[in-house]
């Protein structure tokens, strides 16, 4: 642990903690300052001026990042309208019908997304307390409850990911890997920021985006210049 702390301390060298960097420069620094031996993620944290006790100020949805984020998303499809072979052909990792639902609690650590249609939702309702806190409960707002299950699987396997505000109005997301070209990560970040700006609730007063920072999986957080236009 001491060795890691020493590396992390060293990673802060050359970074002005009080300075906000242009987005490209901040991402480049985050890549250079990663201290993991593996190809870690580049993450973004966005602080929004939202009162999440108000339903209309709770942001949740999904976005297809233009360059993906490099993560292998493990998808479970629950449907009785398509075959296992059809689901597998578009990249689904697991597949089942109504009788498969009983297996879900045993495989929570093996799946990242559950995609289904409206007909299956009443059967999944009994697992709400298990799936909800883990962010696994299918939801039409993020495209995981849909009539076109196969298309949804393709999108999530290509890099479509969920975004949502936490209790304090923060959004945390992976927007790429350390090994990505910096411009590719910048494009992903801008796509997310533009989407969030377009979702600004009409009831928000004052500065909407209050803080932005990017960071590697292990390494320093770097402030980003905010453009609220």
UniProtKB/Swiss-Prot annotation:
InterPro entries the UniProt entry points to: Ribosom_uL1_bac-type, Ribosomal_uL1, Ribosomal_uL1-like, Ribosomal_uL1/biogenesis, Ribosomal_uL1_3-a/b-sand, Ribosomal_uL1_CS
Record bears the keyword RNA-binding: yes
Single annotated GO MF: tRNA binding
GO-annotated cellular components: large ribosomal subunit
Keyword annotations: Repressor, Ribonucleoprotein, Ribosomal protein, RNA-binding, rRNA-binding, Translation regulation, tRNA-binding
The keyword Ribosomal protein belongs to this UniProt entry's keyword annotation: yes
PROSITE patterns given in the database record: RIBOSOMAL_L1
Subunit structure as annotated in this protein's UniProt entry: Part of the 50S ribosomal subunit.
Function: Binds directly to 23S rRNA. The L1 stalk is quite mobile in the ribosome, and is involved in E site tRNA release. Protein L1 is also a translational repressor protein, it controls the translation of the L11 operon by binding to its mRNA.
Family classification: Belongs to the universal ribosomal protein uL1 family.
Identification of the protein by name: Large ribosomal subunit protein uL1
Gene behind this protein: rplA
